[in-house]
Every structure is written in C-alpha cells, then in structure tokens.
Amino acid sequence: AIIKEIDKYTGVLNPLNFKAIRNDLQQKGLLNRADDYLKASGKLAAILFKEEIERALKTPQQSGFQLLDLHDFPGQGTALVGLLDAFWDSKGLIEPQRFREFCAPVVPLARFDKAVWRANETFKAHIDIANYGAETYGADQLRWALTDGDGQVYAEGTGDEVNVVLDRTERAAGRWRRRA
C-alpha cells in the first residue's frame, strides 16, 4: 500500500507526498483504512483501464493506443495513476494474466447494446477479435462460451462466420468488417 511504499525510498528521493497522505489519514483516524482505500480506488482504475483498452480495440481503423502510464509517477507532483507502484512492483490490483485478457496481441471482444439486462430479456452479443498478432486465424478456430463466475455454461458456439485476419478487427456476426 501507499504507506508501506514509504520504506522503498532509500535513496535521495524523500517520499514527502506519501508521508503527507499518511499523516493526514493518521490525524483523521483513518490510517487503518489506507489499504482499503488503495484497493478500492485501484480496482476501479483497473476496470477503467480495461474499458479504455477494449474501446480502443473495438474502434475501426484505429491502429493502436497509448496509456498515460502503468506505474505511478513519483516526480514533481504525485500522479498515482498506475496499476504498479513507482518501482514497477505490483500493487496487487490485477494479476498479469487477467490484464493480458484485454491487452494482448489477440483479444476476444463482445459487443452488446447495453450493460444491464433483466432476467426476462434475451442477451445478444456480437463477437469481435482484435488481432495484431503474427498469425491469421480461420473461423474453424473460434469457439466461444457464455459462462458465469462459477464456470456454469449458459451458451456456447463456434465461429462459422468468423474470419480473423492479421492486423484487423472483424465482427464475427458480419455487421461490419474492417479490411485493408
């Protein structure tokens, strides 16, 4: 956590910013909640990173994206913007494998009309594949499943209409296709 990070500064840089945060929390009787605050805001940051990256990958004719930073900026003015601390160590907010699920050379994406569905509604989605990897994939290589957190499968299928080509994002259901 931020308070524990103070001990990592062993050189000439004095973490006055973190000490001020620690002192402020201590004066307010909230120092024991510092880890909770860090985790809550950090988990939100991870969700927002995912949303931003997926939106970029779904954008037709976009060739990439740039993030402000993945680690906190410790310089002139504190910017605790990263999923990693200023020493590039994990803050425990997201596992590397989970991050690679939405930030990798090949990323499966789902498009749907809204984020909240009622139990009596039919969920409809279109599968997209963002492929900036070295290989081209055929429709016979795509299998998908809609599952819950416990692994219960609600629907599954194959990509008989899908064509995933190199350096393109293509819609599995064929509504739009981006080609060179």
Task: Identify what each model region corresponds to.
Residues D167-R179:
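Aromatic sugar-binding surface patches on proteins
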Residues A1-T158, L166:
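Substrate-binding clefts and catalytic carboxylate motifs of secreted carbohydrate-active enzymes
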